[in-house]
Amino acid sequence: MPQRLQILYNTVIVPKLQKELGYTNIHQVPRLEKIVINRGLGDASQNAKALESSIAEISAITGQRPVITRAKKAIASFKIRKGMPVGLMVTLRRERMYAFLDRLINIALPRIRDFRGVSPKSFDGRGNYTLGIREQLIFPEINYDSVDQIRGMDISIVTTAETDEEGRALLKEFGMPFAS
């Protein structure tokens, strides 16, 4: 079933951006490709409980089980051996991606303390946007009592936009609250 933002994109955003950016073909209009949620877990190698609770939290937030990222090589000063778990990652596409973006923009971001909008400078030069979240409690799926430690995550929104201006225009149409 198509998500609310997906319907909005197809009916309102595409024609508006096509006119705004001067495209002749609707396939030239930038679109969302995927959303990648990443969480680094420094203590996961020593603390298996932290890994399990993080898997449960990210599964609840995204509706998809995360993949465990492992160390590529040993780093003695961090007490990490090759193959040890160092983080979690989820790649969302299609309906789940639009559902997550909808919840992020309309529910989670406004719940951040002293929220004045997300930084418009976090584009990578190719139209992709990344934001860091300091605590997982902003998501309504997380039960406050079940959280053992406050952990953040990185959210990367990958678009087909070729410039930052196109990416910003696309996310602004979706309702992303950029700080002025």
Curated annotation (Swiss-Prot):
Top-level taxon in the UniProt lineage: Bacteria
GO annotation terms (biological process): translation
Secretion signal, residue range per the UniProt entry: none
Pfam family membership, one: Ribosomal_L5
UniProt keyword list: Ribonucleoprotein, Ribosomal protein, RNA-binding, rRNA-binding, tRNA-binding
PROSITE patterns: RIBOSOMAL_L5
One annotated GO molecular function: tRNA binding
InterPro entries linked: Ribosomal_uL5, Ribosomal_uL5_bac-type, Ribosomal_uL5_C, Ribosomal_uL5_CS, Ribosomal_uL5_dom_sf, Ribosomal_uL5_N
Gene Ontology CC terms, in alphabetical order: ribonucleoprotein complex; ribosome
Similarity field: Belongs to the universal ribosomal protein uL5 family.
PANTHER family listed in its UniProt record: 60S RIBOSOMAL PROTEIN L11-RELATED (PTHR11994)
Record text on subunit structure and interactions: Part of the 50S ribosomal subunit; part of the 5S rRNA/L5/L18/L25 subcomplex. Contacts the 5S rRNA and the P site tRNA. Forms a bridge to the 30S subunit in the 70S ribosome.
Its job: This is one of the proteins that bind and probably mediate the attachment of the 5S RNA into the large ribosomal subunit, where it forms part of the central protuberance. In the 70S ribosome it contacts protein S13 of the 30S subunit (bridge B1b), connecting the 2 subunits; this bridge is implicated in subunit movement. Contacts the P site tRNA; the 5S rRNA and some of its associated proteins might help stabilize positioning of ribosome-bound tRNAs.
UniProt protein name: Large ribosomal subunit protein uL5
